[in-house]
Amino acid sequence: MRRTGAPTQADSRGRGRARGGWPGAEATPSLPLGGSRGRESQMKETIMNQEKLAKLQAQVRIGGKGTARRKKKVVHRTATADDKKLQFSLKKLGVNNISGIEEVNMFTNQGTVIHFNNPKVQASLAANTFTITGHAETKQLTEMLPSILNQLGADSLTSLRRLAEALPKQSVDGKAPLATGEDDDDEVPDLVENFDEASKNEAN
């Protein structure tokens, strides 16, 4: 004899039990519709993802025959960008413009001078920072003479003395020694009279 449509009652475990049914008979949980189809679509997606990954790996392959050269991206930094960063950093330090400076000379250990003509000078005494902005020229110490003499320090004066000592030696080495009896002043006439005696005679 078959019983149909028997009402179910949930037990403490949450499983449905047929009331008045056979002992041990339980209601089977219903499966979601299209479960096998969902699994198939998931498998297809993973296969497609693996294919895409393989294509990407083939494109990114480094080295080997038939691969294109990898171009290194070179970022060109302009001087204006560096200047902006520098000005921003200087603004943080609180620098002030110093006006009325016509030239700045920086003396090096090699005896050369880094010369700035009409530079922009900024200073921050609290940060002990000075900036000199402008066109710089590297010149020899001898080129800057005599206007630079009052700017020379002790080290520069010693190097100037060395240069002064070296110059006569170079001039002597550069010229051939004069032969005896040869007159070096051809254009200057010889003095015949004594001018001192002539002036004394005029005074008397």
Curated annotation (Swiss-Prot):
GO cellular component: cytosol; nascent polypeptide-associated complex; nucleus
Keyword terms: Chaperone, Cytoplasm, Methylation, Nucleus, Phosphoprotein, Protein transport, Transcription, Transcription regulation, Transport
Regions of compositional bias (Acidic residues) in chain numbering: 181-190
GO BP terms in the entry: in utero embryonic development; negative regulation of protein localization to endoplasmic reticulum; protein transport
Localization: Cytoplasm; Nucleus
Keyword Ribonucleoprotein assigned: no
Biased composition annotated in UniProt, kind: Polar residues: 1-11
SMART domains, per database record: NAC
PROSITE patterns tied to this protein: NAC_AB
First and last residue of the signal peptide: none
Subunit structure: Part of the nascent polypeptide-associated complex (NAC), which is a heterodimer of NACA and BTF3 (via NAC-A/B domains). NAC associates with ribosomes through the BTF3/NACB subunit. Both subunits can contact nascent polypeptide chains.
Family in the record: Belongs to the NAC-beta family.
Protein name: Transcription factor BTF3
Organism, as annotated: Mus musculus (Mouse)
